[in-house]
Amino acid sequence: MDDVGHGRTLLSGHSSLNCVARLMAVALDVAETREPLSPDRAWWLRVPAVLLGPRSVFFALREDDPDDVAARSEPLLLIVWMAGAAAVLATPTAGALLDKPEYDAPLVAVWAFVAGGLYGAVGYLLFGFALFFGTRLLGSLGDFRRERQVVGFALTPLALSLLVLFPVRLALYGADTFRDGGPDEGTGEAALLALQLGFVVWSLALLAIGVRVVHGWTWLRTSAAVAAGIALLAAILGVFLLI
């Protein structure tokens, strides 16, 4: 009986997520019916929607209208910057900033803002190029812009981790978050790292969904394209490490 109840709970949770995604899609359709949404507003609404109903968001990337394409730039800028900040704040470098006498809390914030932007921009272009290579290898006729935008919206879970995990880390460890050693090492830190990796896996799943939807491919072809892109990225990083 316990197994049956547990199964029903899982099914109920899955159904709830599906209902939320459908309600968001219906709300967007109703809003468009009552009053046509501007491209800018529509793409801002798609930022949270990609977490629950990614297929409709990635399908919208097929649109080549100049106004629609331009409307994606600001949401993508925010996503890429937040994802970059989440990435740099999880590095060992960030974990030892306050060990340096020249750093204080305001300077750490400035460092996270600047380094996050640079890290995000480089990663966005590099991952976008790798995906462009992978999809071209599998016969895509799409351009670099569309591939990097697929990457950008796939980074939304990683950007979300900045709002979810980093405040938890600060609440648990305070300034020790930016010091080497101390209470921010051990089981708690391992749990936070596992959660961070969970957000990374979520982003990879969205990337695969995005490639499949944008190109209309099978899962096998999609997986091959993503794998080819990751292989190229690994090769590029390997060359940099050897230099």
Task: Name the predicted role of every residue range.
Residues 96-100, 127-141:
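Membrane-helix interface/capping segments
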Residues 1-7:
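Alpha-helix boundary/capping motif
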Residues 94-112, 174-185:
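Membrane-interface interhelical loops and short amphipathic "cap" helices
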Residues 41-44, 114-122, 191-201:
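Hydrophobic alpha-helical transmembrane segments of multi-pass membrane proteins
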Residues 20-86, 90:
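N-terminal juxtamembrane cytosolic/stromal segments of multi-pass membrane proteins
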Residues 131-133, 140-243:
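Hydrophobic alpha-helical transmembrane segments and adjacent short intramembrane/lumenal linkers
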Residues 84-99, 237-240:
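Juxtamembrane "helix exit" motif at the C-terminal ends of alpha-helical transmembrane segments
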Residues 76, 80-84, 88, 116-125, ...:
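Alpha-helical transmembrane spans of integral membrane proteins, capturing the lipid-embedded, hydrophobic core
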